[in-house]
């Protein structure tokens, strides 16, 4: 679908569609004429998230192999600054003894940042290549603007919350925490279970939706600027918004990391 033949409404709708695979037939579907189901996979979001994850691993592995005790290079210094920043954040916010939290926090921060950073690419660049070179019906390049990706990451954090809660308190302690707080009486077990259950489930939901909402809104603004304004005036709004969006990209990655650390710290504490 050539963007020059679209109305502004078609242009916006086209850029909000994912490249989808029907898992029942293992064939690409036309997102304009297909309603997503449980068996529909957004393969563009999966592809870019995996590629960016591998990029993160490659960058840090390269620095680790070349690290020296002498004067570090600029890239090594930059990576060391990120590691030091994340390590300091974990040290301040996590009060447990697990050695996994710092590497996890580093992975979360850099991976989410790289996914968010895709939002700064020209809105038509990769979709144009996908359409005209590979014949793809649609392509979205910002994985964190896909609610499936953000909620999947939040689900991973939720599983870790349950794991650390049971590890530190035991199954009995975890169940007691859900049933005997905030009212420490057996008669209030149903009320406690509802209150604590909602509190527990709200953590991954809010974690995933917060990241999705902010990145989706940022992506939508770029699309609106490109779809509704003439090309010669787009730079007037695009450049200031892109500069401001750099702050949003970094802040959202930081918030996701901080909340992950805080939730796991809460799960590791005795009450």
Curated annotation (Swiss-Prot):
Domain of life where this protein originates: Bacteria
Stored Pfam families: ATP-synt_A
Bilayer topology annotation: Multi-pass membrane protein
PROSITE patterns: ATPASE_A (PS00449)
Subcellular location: Cell inner membrane
Database matches in HAMAP family: ATP_synth_a_bact (MF_01393)
Protein name: ATP synthase subunit a
Species: Klebsiella pneumoniae (strain 342)
């Amino acid at each position: 679908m050539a963007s020059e033949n679209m109305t502004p409404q078609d242009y916006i709708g086209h850029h909000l569609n994912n490249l989808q695979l029907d898992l029942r037939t293992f064939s690409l579907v036309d997102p304009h004429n297909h309603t997503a189901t449980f068996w529909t996979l957004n393969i563009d979001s999966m592809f870019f998230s995996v590629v960016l994850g591998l990029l993160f691993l490659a960058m840090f592995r390269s620095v680790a192999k070349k690290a020296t005790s002498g004067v570090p290079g600029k890239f090594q210094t930059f990576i060391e600054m990120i590691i030091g920043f994340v390590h300091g954040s974990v040290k301040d916010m996590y009060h447990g003894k697990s050695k996994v939290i710092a590497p996890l926090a580093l992975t979360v921060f850099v991976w989410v940042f790289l996914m968010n950073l895709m939002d700064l690419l020209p809105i038509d660049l990769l979709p144009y290549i996908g359409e005209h070179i590979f014949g793809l019906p649609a392509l979205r390049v910002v994985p964190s603007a896909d609610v499936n990706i953000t909620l999947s990451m939040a689900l991973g954090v939720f599983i870790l919350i349950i794991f650390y809660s049971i590890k530190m308190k035991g199954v009995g302690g975890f169940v007691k925490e859900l049933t005997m707080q905030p009212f420490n009486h057996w008669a209030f077990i149903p009320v406690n279970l509802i209150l604590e259950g909602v509190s527990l489930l709200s953590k991954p939901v809010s974690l995933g939706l917060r990241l999705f909402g902010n990145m989706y809104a940022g992506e939508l603004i770029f699309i609106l600027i490109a779809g509704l304004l003439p090309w010669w005036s787009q730079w007037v709004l695009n450049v200031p918004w892109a500069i401001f969006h750099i702050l949003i990209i970094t802040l959202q990655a930081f918030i996701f990391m901080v909340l992950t650390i805080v939730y796991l710290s809460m799960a590791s504490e005795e009450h």
